[in-house]
């Protein structure tokens, strides 16, 4: 692993420090200010004419990002999480320690500098070192400074390196943290209670997806990593909670692309005595709050598309297929004609798909990617909505919506099915679909039906994909860009180091 010549040179320098009686992995020294706080506190120091006050001594830390040696002095750029700060180190101040520094210090090392503020000839606020300590000696060179880390695959596999050399990446994940905390704060302000439900389920449910399977040794039974928390959250509504939410991971054993990762973060929330129309209004308020919190305009650019949050619309599923997808009602209303149409368009579909699933295929191919401004699509076919409430005036459609922005599904919500007999029949239909080969059809969950039999009040529930939400609000083009450690195919890592900084 460490046979590379550049690594061996650094290991030799670490050992050389030990021979001088210095621990290359020192502990216990503390900074007095972050780099950003130093720059703010001493911003009044403008030039060399400013008196140098050695009594104003501070300690700062960071990773060496740039090193310029000039005989008996050197300039060092050090970076902590807050900012980059320049340090000036001279032999006049450090004496023999300066010789050790010149011998051992390299880009990538973690250091502590203790000194006073001053400004260079160019007016750059810096710290004039009185003490200098190597806290952690790097033994692997960073990627070449002018080109950074551009290999996409390597960036995802070695995210720690990506964060070191690409400053914008860290900004994305700071913004992700702000988005998640803002979503949490919004729901708390709306009166929702945050809860936690199981991550391992005896029966996978809450969504149509293929689960990951694990084994519980103590119980000697299989368990499933959850594909959604929905059925547990609705059990809480049965139990008397009226507004709950959970922000956590879901797992779906399916394909990966630029908008899908098998392990992803969602918020799901359930609201007793409300309907899906109330959720639409709540979603609008949520986005208004997020745009304000993130200081974003109502118009944002995503993937070269202008998304205008002031142009939010609501349209029914069939109307979207007709007016946006360009498919006539005569075709949409007849299962055989719709199947023939899809095949004519070159779309591969199974001949035994139900009418509702054929409509879903048509929607995915002809409508979804065209929904740029926030669009709430309502009145979904009941066949593809096994947990949603039937519409009172048309039992073939569900009181359900999905929110699409920039051509992607962002949220799914509906008035919840709370009729236990209807739910039991829907589960039976799902089991029949599974027996026909539909691996994503839902399992029978009699325990959940029994919970519903104790009656759940009229309730509306919704899920929002946090990762896609972060993509939208940060402009990220791939879901891997907003997940710190995305799923990757295993490879044998040769830990190759191609060159020195």
Swiss-Prot record:
InterPro entries: Aa-tRNA-synt_II, aa-tRNA-synth_II, aa-tRNA-synth_II/BPL/LPL, Lys-tRNA-ligase_II, Lys-tRNA-ligase_II_N, Lys-tRNA-synth_II_C, NA-bd_OB-fold, NA-bd_OB_tRNA. Its EC number is 6.1.1.6. Keywords: Aminoacyl-tRNA synthetase, ATP-binding, Cytoplasm, Ligase, Magnesium, Metal-binding, Nucleotide-binding, Protein biosynthesis. Mg(2+) 2 binds at residue 409. Mg(2+) 1 binds at residues 402, 409. The keyword Cytoplasm applies. One of its GO terms (molecular function) is lysine-tRNA ligase activity. It is found in: Cytoplasm. GO terms for biological process: lysyl-tRNA aminoacylation. It is an enzyme of class 6 (ligase). Pfam families: tRNA-synt_2 (PF00152), tRNA_anti-codon (PF01336). SUPFAM superfamilies: Class II aaRS and biotin synthetases, Nucleic acid-binding proteins. Binds 3 Mg(2+) ions per subunit. It catalyses: tRNA(Lys) + L-lysine + ATP = L-lysyl-tRNA(Lys) + AMP + diphosphate. GO terms for cellular component: cytosol. PANTHER family: LYSINE--TRNA LIGASE, CHLOROPLASTIC_MITOCHONDRIAL, LYSYL-TRNA SYNTHETASE. Homodimer. NCBIfam families: lysS_bact, PRK00484.1. Belongs to the class-II aminoacyl-tRNA synthetase family. This is Lysine--tRNA ligase. The lineage of its organism: Bacteria, Pseudomonadati, Campylobacterota, Epsilonproteobacteria, Campylobacterales.
